């Protein structure tokens, strides 16, 4: 089987939406029956985004196999059925780390290790490895053409086109076509210069995706085609839309998938986008609206919670409810009190690290519990709910997590000291261990308690969800909290760790140690988020009576 590669680059400015465009194209190709995957190559020096600030970089998306990756992989999984893995994302830092390890080991037999050929060869090897077994692989190059950091990646894909053959490789370039209000026209010059930059390093784009706030007129597309040496039918207009789920249809309507299939000599049926049409219909025709407060510590950059925000929207789709998400800084709860939580139909506390804002989250969990407001806690959101219950119901004064107060009297949340690494070996870690790559990561099995709320929601006795955390419920103090009424609704496959808690005699109070947002998709939703939005809607109706 021959694998075909589509290399996706961006020019003029960053944040054009390369990830969404690549994922949308992949969705169309998948709808034509092709086996498709997507890779993201990030030019930064960090080995992975695991230790990067969410306020700078956005969320860290966790794959099934436990890789901490770029948030674009979340977009990929929400658009196509193929699950991402650690093979789908790597960085300059990872490449250099691998090459330097080989150099120290003597693998290069004393050769002078250089960017070309050693770094570029390592990039090519990883791309080929990630593409094995697929009909089409889309490879998104992070950053903007012209950045120094991207040059090794661009050189590597240029070489791949020569080595694999142009009949099995395509270059797709996203570029900005700005509208000038003063003259009342769009301007193509930035696109021409961006393509010129690509040409200077030996890459001739085959497809141009023109990003604009409006449809790019046919005469302007013809002009771009002429001056950029691209067929006119391969110049695609991609205007701003009110829903990203409209983009597959927008690209298909301009024949992009047909052009690619002909170029790769792929004989496959027409794309059936009926599932996406259903998503668009549900999104455009809600029967009601709810307001859900998300109380977090990184809310100045909503991308820090990208998957949670999308999962809430998916929960809305499954209930035909429009979800209005109100982002609330947990530190504001500490300084201004619970007044800012009033008027919400439900409350969600997402994950996070560090002590800043945690007391505000604990106050939030208590407010939801005492006022019968639907509550969903994720990761840290579960831990603060447990701390609240321990303090205010189980009479464990000043209960806390050892992450925040190492010597507290009631450490109801504590560090896991024994881990299994990716090779299955037992490893002992402590608070002094490296931060990078030292968490419970990836898909883990969870057993649900028979008569629990989550057992009803999932309609299954055992589930698999993804984790990203270092701290767990302290089993030594668990009995005292359970005796006070808290219910453990889910445990790890080996029955050792608490995964889900519920508050009995509450309309809807669920908190989980895992991250359900990573497996939510617009077509399928997720049981927890669908149930949570439904509970918010029911709470709203009760309040209106």
Curated annotation (Swiss-Prot):
pH dependence: Optimum pH is 8.7.
Residues annotated for Mg(2+) binding in this entry: 72, 140
Subcellular localization: Cytoplasm
Pfam families, A to Z: CTP_synth_N, GATase
Subunit structure, interactors included: Homodimer that associates to form homotetramer in the presence of ATP and UTP. The substrate nucleotides ATP and UTP act synergistically to promote oligomerization of CTPS from inactive dimers to active tetramers.
Keywords: ATP-binding, Cytoplasm, Glutamine amidotransferase, Ligase, Magnesium, Metal-binding, Nucleotide-binding, Pyrimidine biosynthesis
Stored InterPro entries: Class_I_gatase-like (IPR029062), CTP_synthase (IPR004468), CTP_synthase_N (IPR017456), GATASE (IPR017926), GATase1_CTP_Synthase (IPR033828), P-loop_NTPase (IPR027417)
Record-linked SUPFAM superfamilies: Class I glutamine amidotransferase-like, P-loop containing nucleoside triphosphate hydrolases
Family: Belongs to the CTP synthase family.
UniProt cross-references to HAMAP family, sorted A to Z: PyrG
UniProt-annotated binding residues for L-glutamine: 352, 380-383, 403, 470
Inhibition and activation profile: Allosterically activated by GTP, when glutamine is the substrate; GTP has no effect on the reaction when ammonia is the substrate. The allosteric effector GTP functions by stabilizing the protein conformation that binds the tetrahedral intermediate(s) formed during glutamine hydrolysis. Also activated by magnesium; the enzyme requires more Mg(2+) for full catalytic activity than required simply to complex the nucleotide substrates. Inhibited by the product CTP, via allosteric rather than competitive inhibition. Also inhibited by divalent metal ions such as copper and zinc.
Miscellaneous comment in the UniProt entry for this protein: CTPSs have evolved a hybrid strategy for distinguishing between UTP and CTP. The overlapping regions of the product feedback inhibitory and substrate sites recognize a common feature in both compounds, the triphosphate moiety. To differentiate isosteric substrate and product pyrimidine rings, an additional pocket far from the expected kinase/ligase catalytic site, specifically recognizes the cytosine and ribose portions of the product inhibitor.
Domain notes: Sequence consists of two domains: the C-terminal glutamine amide transfer (GAT) domain catalyzes the hydrolysis of glutamine; the N-terminal synthase domain catalyzes the amination of UTP.
Pathway assignment: Pyrimidine metabolism; CTP biosynthesis via de novo pathway; CTP from UDP: step 2/2
Location (main, coarse): cytoplasm
GO biological process: 'de novo' CTP biosynthetic process; CTP biosynthetic process; protein homotetramerization; pyrimidine nucleobase biosynthetic process
Positions of region (Amidoligase domain): 2-266
Binding locations of CTP: 14, 147-149, 187-192, 223
Domain of life: Bacteria
Keyword presence, Ligase: yes
Glutamine amidotransferase type-1 domain boundaries: 291-542
Protein name (database record): CTP synthase
Function noted in UniProt: Catalyzes the ATP-dependent amination of UTP to CTP with either L-glutamine or ammonia as the source of nitrogen. Regulates intracellular CTP levels through interactions with the four ribonucleotide triphosphates.
Binding site for UTP: 14, 187-192, 223
Taxon lineage: Bacteria, Pseudomonadati, Pseudomonadota, Gammaproteobacteria, Enterobacterales
UniProt GO cellular component terms: cytoophidium; cytosol; protein-containing complex
């Amino acid at each position: 089987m021959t694998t075909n590669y589509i290399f996706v680059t961006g020019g003029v400015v960053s944040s054009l939406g390369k990830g969404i465009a690549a994922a949308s194209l992949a969705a169309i190709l998948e709808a034509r029956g092709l086996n498709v995957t997507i890779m993201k190559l990030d030019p930064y020096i960090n080995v992975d985004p695991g230790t990067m600030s969410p306020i700078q970089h956005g969320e860290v998306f966790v794959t099934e196999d436990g890789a901490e990756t770029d948030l674009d992989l979340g977009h990929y999984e929400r658009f196509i059925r193929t699950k991402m893995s650690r093979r789908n994302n790597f960085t300059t830092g990872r490449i250099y780390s691998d090459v330097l390890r080989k150099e120290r080991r003597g693998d290069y037999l004393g050769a002078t290790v250089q960017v070309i050929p050693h770094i570029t060869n390592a990039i090519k090897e990883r791309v080929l490895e990630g593409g094995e077994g697929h009909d089409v692989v889309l490879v998104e190059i992070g950053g903007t053409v012209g950045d120094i950091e991207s040059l090794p990646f661009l050189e590597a894909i240029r070489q791949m086109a020569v080595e694999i053959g142009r009949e099995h490789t395509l270059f797709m370039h996203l570029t900005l076509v700005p509208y000038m209000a003063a003259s009342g026209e769009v301007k193509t010059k930035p696109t021409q210069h961006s393509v010129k930059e690509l040409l200077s390093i030996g890459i001739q784009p085959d497809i141009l995706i023109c990003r604009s706030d409006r449809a790019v007129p046919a005469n302007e597309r013809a002009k771009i085609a002429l001056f950029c040496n691209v067929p006119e039918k391969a110049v695609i207009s991609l205007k701003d839309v009110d829903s990203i789920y409209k983009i597959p249809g927008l690209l298909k309507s301009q024949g992009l998938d047909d052009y690619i299939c002909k170029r790769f000599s792929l004989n496959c049926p027409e794309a059936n986008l009926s599932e996406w049409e259903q998503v668009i219909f549900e999104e455009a025709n809600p029967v009601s609206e709810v307001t859900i407060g998300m109380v977090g510590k990184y809310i100045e950059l909503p991308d820090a919670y990208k998957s949670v925000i999308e999962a809430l929207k998916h929960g809305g789709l499954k209930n035909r409810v429009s979800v209005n998400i109100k982002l609330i800084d947990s530190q504001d709860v500490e300084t201004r009190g619970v007044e800012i939580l009033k008027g919400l139909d439900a409350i969600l506390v997402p994950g996070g690290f560090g002590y800043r804002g945690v007391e505000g989250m604990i106050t939030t969990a208590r407010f939801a519990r005492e006022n019968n407001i639907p509550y969903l806690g994720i990761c840290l959101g579960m831990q603060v709910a447990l701390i609240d219950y321990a303090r205010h119901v189980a009479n464990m004064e000043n209960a806390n997590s050892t992450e925040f107060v190492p010597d507290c009297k009631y450490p109801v949340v504590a560090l896991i000291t024994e881990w299994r690494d990716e090779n299955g070996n037992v490893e002992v870690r402590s608070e002094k261990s490296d931060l990078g790559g030292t968490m419970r990561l990836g898909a883990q099995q969870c057993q649900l308690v028979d008569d629990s709320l989550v057992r009803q929601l999932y309609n299954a006795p055992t589930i698999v969800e993804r984790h990203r955390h270092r701290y767990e419920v302290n089993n030594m103090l668990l009995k005292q909290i359970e005796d006070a009424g808290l219910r453990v609704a889910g445990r790890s496959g080996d029955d050792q760790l608490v995964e889900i808690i519920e508050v009995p005699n509450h309309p809807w109070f669920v908190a989980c140690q895992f991250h359900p947002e990573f497996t939510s998709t617009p077509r399928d939703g997720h049981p927890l988020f669908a149930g949570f939005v439904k509970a918010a809607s029911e709470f709203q109706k009760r309040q209106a009576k």
